[in-house]
Amino acid sequence: MTKFVFVTGGVVSSLGKGIAAASLGAILESRGIKVTMLKLDPYINVDPGTMSPFQHGEVFVTDDGAETDLDLGHYERFISARMGKRNNFTTGQIYETVIKKERRGEYLGKTVQVIPHITDEIKAHVKRGAEGADVAIVEVGGTVGDIESLPFLEAIRQMGIEEGRSNTCFMHLTLLPWIPTAGELKTKPTQHSVKELREIGIQPDILLCRADRAIPEDEKRKIALFTNVPHEAVISVVDADSIYSIPRMLHDQMLDEIVCHKLNLLARAADLSSWNRIVHALKNPKHEVNVAFVGKYVDLTESYKSLTEALIHAGIHNESKVNIHYIDSEEVEKHGTGELEKMDAILVPGGFGKRGTEGKIAAIRYARESKTPYLGICLGMQLAVIEFARNVAGLKDANSTEFDPHTPHPLVGLITEWKNADGKVEQRSEDSDLGGTMRLGAQKCPIVPDTKAFTIYGAEVNERHRHRYEVNNHYVDKLEKAGLVVSARTPTEQLCEMVELPSEVHPWFVACQFHPEFTSNPRTGHPLFNAYIAAALANRKA
């Protein structure tokens, strides 16, 4: 029988519920417990796929093609379980399911209400996502007190009763703000947050108290007294240099012991040696490299969360500190590539829309001509192909139909027919709905021998995709004759998956249509990013 840990948040948002939940998952997994994780998002969007990165941050794509919250990326980086469509759902999905059932007559003419119909559907989704695990850690998005969160909080309250108190544990994350004029941490916001949670019918078993400094014991005792939480279950979560030190911080305060005791779990002692090695490598790098990250959402780095973490992981495995320099591609358009001259490597990530693309193309041209190691991802590959077509293959004004529908040389275009993850053929056009109409999820494809891609991946690559446009096969032969190497293609449609320049032309120039950052983790890194940072090390500027 699966046991549940429900994680809620109070006082303010963005306290790090996802990191705290993932860290607990990592500790429990190190004790031999099979863990899965779920994220419940209270917004009405069906999924975050069509939301602006400025609104929501990164969209994390799972193996089965779900467009999900970025917290699922944290889950996969901290625990070994792979996330999927069942691990993240929204108010929009719940209401969509309930309304479809009502239209089919499944409620037998009853008045459809938030309680019990919406809450029952939430509970069914949670149980479905938790199947097969010893412990499911369920994070409820938003903040206690938000009107959007109420059906989710009511659903987990009911589960606390239905599953039994020895099978459920409630963990609440709050903020203890430091007031400089008073010279003290304030506990009142936490007291009020727990009071509001208790009014809903949930008594937290554990409090995780976020602060920018250590919490004095007398403050912990005060919190315990006024929140009805045992003193030992008031956990101090202070700001850390690295998120990968959080599992050790929580374990040192016996969080896993408290959870195991509450859930009647018998498990071996925790082994956090791999996390200790990761933190040691982060704190004691032998080298340092500077990477230019040329994008258009650089003012909000959460938009590229998995990519940033993948570079950090590669630094760990190259014993290097990776200094990521976020460069706005529109600034490159205005002021040129001078800022790139002091960089050891250049990266252009994925993205959508025309804005900033010419700046990215200028950065790619600089990387190619200066022989600076280059990694292009998704749009970063498409623009690398366009840059090569314009400046090497002689295809003047080559472009993508996404940016210029009337380009004389459509090097990149909308694929009009594609088999989705269920094997069904989808038709697409520029007028198709934006939501759920991309090539999504993990796909395998063979790699051409004697290429950098083959050295990195071996004979086959299996990575996740999230894009709507593809390199136009009609131009591939001309590009190859001009010197571009297509090192991986899809097995059926023969679409470009990876391109590179030969070693005699450029020391390290690789681009891919997929998103390798989604499968990187701190324990093993990722072969493509590991190779990229190794190339940056070899190219270090004096």
From Swiss-Prot:
ATP binds at residues 14-19, 71. UTP binds at residues 13, 186-191, 222. It comes from the Bacteria. Its EC number is 6.3.4.2. Allosterically activated by GTP, when glutamine is the substrate; GTP has no effect on the reaction when ammonia is the substrate. The allosteric effector GTP functions by stabilizing the protein conformation that binds the tetrahedral intermediate(s) formed during glutamine hydrolysis. Inhibited by the product CTP, via allosteric rather than competitive inhibition. One of its GO terms (cellular component) is cytosol. L-glutamine binds at residues 351, 379-382, 402, 468. Residues 1-265 are annotated as: Amidoligase domain. CTPSs have evolved a hybrid strategy for distinguishing between UTP and CTP. The overlapping regions of the product feedback inhibitory and substrate sites recognize a common feature in both compounds, the triphosphate moiety. To differentiate isosteric substrate and product pyrimidine rings, an additional pocket far from the expected kinase/ligase catalytic site, specifically recognizes the cytosine and ribose portions of the product inhibitor. This is CTP synthase. It comes from Methylobacillus flagellatus (strain ATCC 51484 / DSM 6875 / VKM B-1610 / KT). The gene is pyrG.
